[in-house]
């Protein structure tokens, strides 16, 4: 019996390690996607190289840093793991020196942004679940991870955050994170559930862009 218990324990540890690495990969891919958006914003505002790199890093990591601080994952992964900083800097340099090529790819950039949104939403919700947060808090952490960096980026360049004006931005992140959290109740630590959550978020965001779906805005008197 002890032998069988040991095997079960090892299997559980291996599964947790796989899930942890899966979430880290999602976080890193999302980091690069959002770093590109931050760098593009910097170049558009004619900011120097240092500023572009700062915006690249902020857009890619601010949401994750806020999430980690709130759930007690200290120090935050973005400053503890060299890969986050490296990916952010690479994305910033690529955008700064080859912006003319990236500027021609409006649709691909929107796709990368939507992909980053979905990856961060499910990675944020998944990490919150791993830290034993409740369902509501886990959904909020997924949304914060997905939209936090973009909000800080826009504030730094004196713009209204795109999350308040774009086509179903936060709503898409909310939907993806909710799928992960609800799915985890029935299928704990399930990679397919995370994949479905990502597809829901990315799909909803791209459909909103295509069809110009937006939340209603209050009407002001003339």
Label the predicted regions.
Residues 1-22:
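Short, strongly hydrophobic alpha-helical membrane anchors
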Residues 19-31, 76-90, 134-146:
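Structural signature of hydrophobic alpha-helical transmembrane segments
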Residues 24-37, 55-58, 176:
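The first (N-terminal) embedded transmembrane alpha-helix
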Residues 35-45, 68, 93-106, 151-161, ...:
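C-terminal ends of transmembrane helices
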Residues 50-58, 81-85, 106-117, 141, ...:
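Cytoplasmic-side transmembrane-helix entry/capping segments in multi-pass membrane proteins
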Residues 54-58, 65-71, 140, 144, ...:
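Short, structured motif recognition centered on aromatic/hydrophobic residues
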Residues 56-64, 88, 113-126, 168-181, ...:
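Small-residue-rich segments of transmembrane alpha-helices in multi-pass membrane proteins
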Residues 71-79, 103-109, 128-138, 155-166, ...:
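A cytosolic-side transmembrane-helix exit/cap motif
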